[in-house]
């Protein structure tokens, strides 16, 4: 399936000079959404994944059905202040400032195998922070799964040496 044909390009969003890859059009397409989840399941079905950790917010959209299909639990990796119990937190650099990801401290037992999922990898900062959360929990980072990779931004170079799955590259 040609996933690129299901992804809308939005020029100058969120600011001039940026070409935004809008996956909402992919999500609206029943066959496209099914194909994405089926592809991710096929690539990770035999990996012994205990948990899928989805990065807020579009990682939730793809991560939860993937976890269900893999027979794994789902862990939301949230922006600051969204979780109600004690958290692990990792700060990371943005183009203009800093941000933080958080995860409940009791979300993952040490040694459990985790796949991190997000819709897109660009510079890799958010995904690297997500990996830091898994490390703080003393769990095993199995790998990453992204629908889209923006290769010019070299985000995968910031990530640990684990399997990285992408379905579409630009």
Curated annotation (Swiss-Prot):
Its Gene Ontology molecular function terms?
Answer: adenine binding; adenine phosphoribosyltransferase activity; AMP binding
Q: List cellular component terms (GO).
A: cytoplasm
Which residues are listed as membrane-spanning?
none
Superkingdom of origin organism: Bacteria
Pathway assigned in UniProt: Purine metabolism; AMP biosynthesis via salvage pathway; AMP from adenine: step 1/1
**Major localization listed first in the record, in broad terms:** cytoplasm
Give the catalytic activity: AMP + diphosphate = 5-phospho-alpha-D-ribose 1-diphosphate + adenine
For this protein, the record's PROSITE patterns field holds: PUR_PYR_PR_TRANSFER (PS00103)
Q: Name one GO biological process term.
A: purine ribonucleoside salvage
Keyword presence, Hydrolase: no
Q: Which InterPro entries match?
A: Ade_phspho_trans, PRibTrfase_dom, PRTase-like, UPRTase/APRTase
> Which family is annotated?
Belongs to the purine/pyrimidine phosphoribosyltransferase family.
Assembly, in brief, is: Homodimer.
Query: What task does this protein carry out?
Result: Catalyzes a salvage reaction resulting in the formation of AMP, that is energically less costly than de novo synthesis.
Protein name as annotated: Adenine phosphoribosyltransferase
Q: Which organism is it from?
A: Thermosynechococcus vestitus (strain NIES-2133 / IAM M-273 / BP-1)
């Amino acid at each position: 399936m040609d996933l690129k044909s299901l992804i809308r390009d939005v020029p100058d969003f969120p600011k001039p000079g940026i070409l935004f890859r809008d996956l909402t059009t992919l999500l609206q397409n029943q066959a496209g959404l099914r194909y994405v989840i089926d592809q991710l399941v096929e690539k990770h079905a035999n990996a012994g994944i205990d948990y899928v950790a989805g990065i807020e917010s579009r990682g939730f959209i793809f991560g939860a059905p993937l976890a269900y299909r893999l027979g794994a639990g789902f862990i939301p990796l949230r922006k600051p202040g969204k979780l109600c119990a004690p958290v692990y937190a990792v700060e990371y650099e943005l183009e203009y400032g800093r941000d933080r990801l958080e995860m409940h401290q009791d979300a993952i037992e040490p040694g459990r195998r985790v796949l991190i999922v997000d819709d897109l990898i660009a510079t890799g900062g958010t995904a690297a922070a997500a990996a830091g959360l898994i490390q703080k929990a003393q769990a095993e980072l199995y790998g990453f799964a992204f629908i889209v990779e923006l290769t010019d931004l070299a985000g995968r170079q910031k990530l640990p040496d684990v399997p990285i799955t992408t379905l579409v590259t630009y």
